[in-house]
Amino acid sequence: MTQAARRDCDVLIVGGGAVGSALACALARLPLDTVLVEAQEVRQLSQPSFDTRVTALANGSQQILASLGLWPQLKGYTEAIRTIHISERGRFGAARISAAEADVPALGYTVENQALGRVLWERLRDAPRFTALAPAKVTAIHRDERCVTATIEQAGETRDLRAKLVVAADGARSAVRTALGFDALEHDYEQRAVIFNCATEAPPAGRAFERFTQRGPIALLPLTSGRTGVIWTLPSAVAAEIAALPDDAFRAELQTAFGYRLGRFTRMGARHLHTLVRIASGAVHGPRAVLIGDAALRLHPVAGQGFNLALRDVATLAEVLVDAIEAVGGTDDVGASEPLDRYAAWRAADRERVSTFTHGLIRLFGESLPGMGLGRGIGLVAFDLLPGAKALLARQTMGKAGRLPRLARGLPLS
């Protein structure tokens, strides 16, 4: 990796969080000059993408990271998810998905975001054709049929950089998406997530929980050292008030909502509030530009699918670019329309499937019409007794549904 200025590159990635840096790691194996622009100082790993929150890596995402050679460095920071328990507070019926039933070592893994960021950026330090501009920001973007020209501000200086392709990986409020003229539709769930780590009397021991309540879902994830990560979704009107309660009062509220499947909640970590919205870009590509991760589609966190969907964006984009390179025998034009059209068409079904799944869960378990609670309970019991239904959901949860890119199948890019 170099910090030296470049005036031209093949690929410009805007956004150096987990998604942008994962793409840079994938492209580092290709004969491409890649520049990444990140607003924060990456050496400090202080950007919001790499805070103390936890990411749930699906089984398929673990395979992508393993195919990129990152898993040996990351594995020591992860905890396996071997079962997922799904239930609704105050209703009978529950469903369980297990790694044993799916015939995999784990349904997924949890990892703290800071550890993920550290591993990704350590890999990029050794990438010879990779340049990081950080802290820096893109202040303007112009496109023509030959290239993208980005105006970059860094350390009080401004310069232009030309690229054959620009990749927006700068999150749900993507400035690049706006600058490129992409429209986006936003749905406000009128909910906020209280996110924190805690300890419980009984360690989670590889068990994850999705508990639906009248106020919103509670997700518990197993962490290293016997800790538990919690994502508690609450109505916006009460979330800040509950999050600000003293520890004892907050613990009592959480205990009432979740129950005692892990015994009593004991130590509580710092709480962080996040507003929950669904933001979908009307298009994910255009001339010499492509959107990935939250810049393309921001999801509700109910099923923990956001980063996993983004990693499949990364794996698919890397694959279509390497195929384009090999088809012409060089890096003549990685921003041509054909590979970007192929990328967008490939990713459309996965995005639609995951978006419908997560949005549908919120609507289903948020409905309070008479008889709906009973119907959901019966549905959970029936689901738990139907191997075919469980296998289908397991594939979706593990990121194994639909057509998969080579990295997700354990194959090299080329």
Positions of the model-derived regions?
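Glycine-rich FAD pyrophosphate-binding loop
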Residues: 28-50
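N-terminal FAD cofactor-binding segment of flavoenzymes
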Residues: 49-89
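Conserved FAD-binding catalytic core of PHBH/FMO-like flavoproteins
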Residues: 65, 147, 151, 155-160, ...
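FAD/FMN-dependent oxidoreductases across multiple families
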Residues: 240-335
